Regions:
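Exposed, low-structure sequence patches enriched in small/polar residues
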Residues: 1-302
């Protein structure tokens, strides 16, 4: 047994840790990265390019109800990605573009081997076989301006492709209680967003009529896993994490889950959101007016 310090004032001063009823999860995350970079510079433009390789070891140690288990020991995930960075700066323009890849460590809540019953109608539990995500990210930002007319444009673009995307397997039991467990998607997750704004564009020589416009949009494509048959709930009074994972997941590669043997099927969701607006401004010596219009469109496909 061990000892701990209570997080609250209690006259009874509980100081003995009950090993059987206590749970423990440790994520020993090790990432080794190697990069090969080259740089080119000419006047106001800088270009960096190359490639990177990552070796990621994600070892998870868990202990619950007196049973301990280690996953991922000695196993490495290899990630490869090109690298690109471009910047250009001048009196009229500033442009930056970047492409790189990176992995992300798992949070403890994703691998905890005990159910979270803080909400009795929505019960979640961790997955000790979960693997870290690896994302390839591209960003582009651009700003242009005209010092004579004061017209300008500002834009931004982001595209993200996530391998081993962490999503959730969801199901409801016969009493309407919802359960979910994090899993790695077999299909990559895609996200993109863009935005732009034009401003102070003169429509006549006197610059009394000025035009402006703005636009933005988002796109996402990902999957989740839903039950295809009625699945019984989890017996919380006699819960055993190892037995649960043998039914839900199968072997370390998740053979039962991904084959659909445990009752789950992949569902794909696409979401698109677009919005934009225009405005017209009149600026006279004694009178100023402004007219604007905006619209938004959302689309979801399952």
């Amino acid at each position: 047994s061990g000892s701990f310090v209570p997080g609250f004032s209690d006259k009874r001063e509980y100081t003995v840790l009950a090993e059987y009823w206590s749970s423990l999860s440790e994520n020993r995350y090790f990432r080794n990265t190697a990069q090969l970079l080259a740089q080119y510079r000419k006047e106001q433009t800088t270009v960096q390019f190359g490639a990177s390789a990552e070796a990621v070891n994600n070892e998870i140690y868990t202990k619950s109800y007196g049973i301990s288990r280690t996953t991922g020991k000695g196993e490495y995930l290899w990630n490869y990605s090109p690298f690109l960075y471009i910047s250009h700066s001048s009196e009229k323009a500033f442009i930056v573009a970047r492409y790189n890849g990176t992995s992300k460590a798992l949070s403890n809540s994703l691998i905890t081997p005990v159910p979270d019953i803080s909400n009795p109608t929505f019960i979640s539990m961790g997955n000790i076989y979960l693997e870290p995500e690896f994302s390839n990210n591209f960003t582009l930002s651009a700003n242009f301006n005209n010092k004579k007319t004061f017209a300008y444009f500002s834009g931004y673009l982001m595209v993200d492709n996530v391998n081993r995307n962490i999503v959730y397997a969801n199901w409801f039991d016969e009493e309407g209680v919802q359960y979910n467990v994090p899993v790695n998607s077999k299909k990559a997750g895609n996200r993109a967003s863009f935005s732009g704004q034009f401003g102070s564009i003169p429509l006549n020589e006197k610059k009394s009529f000025l035009f402006g416009a703005s636009f933005s949009g988002t796109y996402s494509r990902g999957c989740s896993y839903q039950n295809i048959n009625r699945i019984k709930g989890v017996d919380m009074d006699n819960f055993n994490y190892s037995s649960f994972m043998e039914w839900f997941w199968g072997n370390s590669a998740g053979d039962r889950f991904y084959s659909g043997e445990s009752g789950f099927k992949e569902s794909l969701t696409k979401r698109i959101s677009l919005s934009g607006g225009v405005n017209l401004r009149y600026k006279g010596e004694r009178f100023t007016s402004r007219v604007s219009f905006s619209a938004t469109r959302d689309m979801v496909e399952y």
